[in-house]
Each structure stands twice: as structure tokens, then as C-alpha cells.
Amino acid sequence: AEKPNDPLFTRKFIPAKLSDNPYLLHSGEYEMMLLSLPELERKRLLEGDWDIAEGAAFSEFNRFHHVVDPFDVPHGWYRVRAADYGYTSPSCVLWGALDHDDNLWIYRELYIKRQNGDELGIKIREMEENDPPPIVSVLDGASWNRTGTGLTVAELINKSGCMFIPADKNRIRGKLELHKRLRVDPESGSNIKIFSNCVNLIRELTSIPLSKTNSEDVDTKASDHAYDALRYMC
């Protein structure tokens, strides 16, 4: 029986690619037309990939190539950690691992508001209790700014035992490094993989737009907390 608050209609997205339609695929002409389209339209109509928003900064991001199901990260892989701090806006902490081929695997995220530096540091330690220590741990530069006589946000976080160092401030260089990692090689694939439980990072990578005033950067007014943490890591 229907309940008062039940939706009248539901939708389910079923992705479809040209390869799913043998008639159109074998004609050849339709495929040539799709290949000539701009990148975003081509990805949608030829590859059935509707993840990327119009004007998104990372149009090469693709769930098939870049998102994987979680697994137990081997202890022999080097661990890395990066964080972008916010209080009224979210803080994001990302945990990654580098395998022996320098592929970067993002396996955990923390996305949380209204945490002081010491509170965030304690939460980080709790979440990584069973992890090997990271070889690199970086935190946004603004967290090191001193606004009064007390400890900075970075000092409060480090006091908990996390031990961050300042992240590279160069926004353009970090974005370019991420583009390199997202690039898909026909034989080896991409050298960045993101666990499917990192939902906020995936959301931002599919939607964050380019800046309207600087085409080399993203729009800093958009939700970019997980993106910034990833940029620091790259």
C-alpha cells in the first residue's frame, strides 16, 4: 500500500553505450559522427558516461577507470595523508597508498564540519589506528596562520600526534599533477584509483567547475575541500 510521503514516480538510470546497439555500431557512420562530437557529448553518447557535469574541470574523470571497490590495502604500500581544514565549511582528510608502480590509491576520506584542530586530530588518529604510519602528511597552508596568541590549527592537530607539514601552495601545479594521474593509458589504465566509499571526493571531481576568471584553475567558490586535499597529495 502507498504511504502518504512515498514518491509517485521513481527513476533508475541505465547506462547505454554504442556497443550495446549492434545495428548502429555496424553501420559505422553513426560512430564516426559521435567521435566528432565535443568531449563531453562524446563521453555521454558514445561511452554512456553521464557522470561529468557541464563545464567540469576534470572531464577525463570516469568511474569505470578511476573508481574501485574497497579492499584491504597491502601493508607494503607507502601510506600518505592530506587534509584541507575548515570549521563552518567542511574539513576533508584523505588517506592514500602508493603501490610499487607509483599508482595512488585513495582508500579513505573524512569529511566533517565544526571540529577544532585538536578534535580533528583525535578523530584522524582514531580512524587510522590500524594503519602503518604515513611517509608524507600534508595540511593546507592556511592552517599554519597565527591569528592570536594561542596555537594555530596546524599546531593543535599536530599536538594530537598526527604530524602534518605544510602543503604546496601552488594551485596550478597541483591541478596539473592531478590531470596527469587521471590520464588513462590504453594498456596500463590510470595511475590513480579512488575507493567507492570516498563519496565526497567522487562528487567533487565530477562536478567542480573551472574558474570563470582563470581557465587554469577550478572555481574556488564551489565545493572543493576534498579536491584540495587530493591536490595536496598529488
What spans do the regions from the language model cover?
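Short acidic/glycine-rich loop or secondary-structure boundary segments that cap or lie
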Residues: L24, E54-A56, P70, S89-V93, ...
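Mg2+-dependent endonuclease catalytic cores in nucleic-acid-processing enzymes, primarily RNase H-like
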Residues: H100-D219
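A residue-level signal for conserved active-site and pocket-lining positions in enzyme catalytic cores
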Residues: A16, L46, V93, S137, ...
